[in-house]
Amino acid sequence: DHRDLHSFPTRRSSDLMPVQTGELREFAIKNELFVLNLNKRQGTSIAGQNTALLKEILAWLEPNAPVYGWEQGVSEDAFVDLVSKSGHPMIPCDWSYNHSLTSLLYSQRQKSTLVRVKNPQFLDYTKKKNFVSFFLSDGDNIQWMMNDFKDFYNAAESEEVRMTYGIAASVLPMMAPAQFDNLLSQQKPNCSILEMLGGGYYYVDNYSENGDRAKNLQVVAERLSAHMRQHRVKLLGVMAMNVKSEAAKEAFQAYVDANDQLEGIVALQYSPYAGGEGDVIWVTNKAGYDIPVITVKYSLWNFGNRNAEREGTPAYIAGRLKQEAQQESFSVVCVHAWSNFSDHGQTEDPLIENQSGDIRGAGAAKLCAGHLNDSFEVVNMQELVWRLRMSQRPEQTKKYLSEVF
């Protein structure tokens, strides 16, 4: 009987699995997890959903306990929203295998592998350009990290466009420490690493709104800080339903309070990614330094026969950036991982790049960068953050660089 929940040995995690999915079965058995299918029929909600049961399980789990897996055939917010509001991170991993083995004795297998970072005091801050940084979406996706993420990560264009890659830098070291070390060892010299999305997939503005939100935000922020500091991850990517909301700002403050080594935050909105319109929100850390939360200004996304206001083809987004060019500006562009484009040279057609292409990730960023002019410079996310800090907070940034480096 599913209502006899006290008979389960652990409330520390649960599995959300599509019907007949076998990849997580051994992990669930070994850890004696409660397993639930959201859809009553595989791949569709047409036969109904076990939503009431899911809510009951989420309320029963310990606060901040992870929910592993995924569900197919429904909008992801249909279940991630419930998981997030209940105070749990979603761990997308329904297509990766053998996590009992990949995570075996993970606490004893932690290496002091460090992310490669730049020393910001050596940047030429007299240079004034329209600085643009591209980063790849979906870095919270564990199964992607375990499978073909390497094809995106090692793309030939990565160095040229100073690509920033989101990685599950707090979850992957526990679920597959060997793969985490492997990915960090392959980081290209001019590419940045961004923790995505704060220790699992959840929305920072509604996380644990059904529980003790302030306490649970502090818990996830402190857990996240430990992992980021251990591996010298200086940048954090988060997602919110409304990146400009007061609830989102409350979460930003929690992350900054917990981590005095955090240099900057990138904020995506669930829909559209660029809902923050490039606005910058400043959050003061405990040492008195203002940390920028940079919202995504545009995203490269293939919508087929149309572009959205702030999402579209490389040519379209480059055109928008050029229209807004100033003496100095700072723009974050998210590259939708699952969008492909085609190369048509210096086209003025805002849609033609959507046609039957296989250019993705850093390749798509290169297409966009190729449409920009000499008033622009493409930099990685860490450099963009420090250039923004020096531009907008020069006195405290100079003070920080003189004291820390």
Report each predicted region and the residues it spans.
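Acidic (Asp/Glu)-rich catalytic clusters
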Residues: 124-126, 151-159, 172-197, 228, ...
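Catalytic grooves of carbohydrate-active enzymes
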Residues: 53-69, 132, 137-163, 170, ...
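Soluble or luminal CAZymes and related metallo-dependent hydrolases
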Residues: 49, 175, 216-223, 313-316, ...
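Long, K/E/R/D-enriched contiguous segments that form extended
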Residues: 178, 184-226, 234
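Short, small-residue-biased leader/transition segments that mark boundaries at the very start
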Residues: 1-13
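Acidic, glycine-rich loop-and-strand cores that form catalytic or ligand-binding grooves
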Residues: 11-33, 289
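Glycine-rich, often proline-containing surface loops adjacent to acidic residues and nearby aromatics
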Residues: 130-133, 161-166, 195-202
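Non-catalytic propeptide/linker segments at domain boundaries
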Residues: 25-159
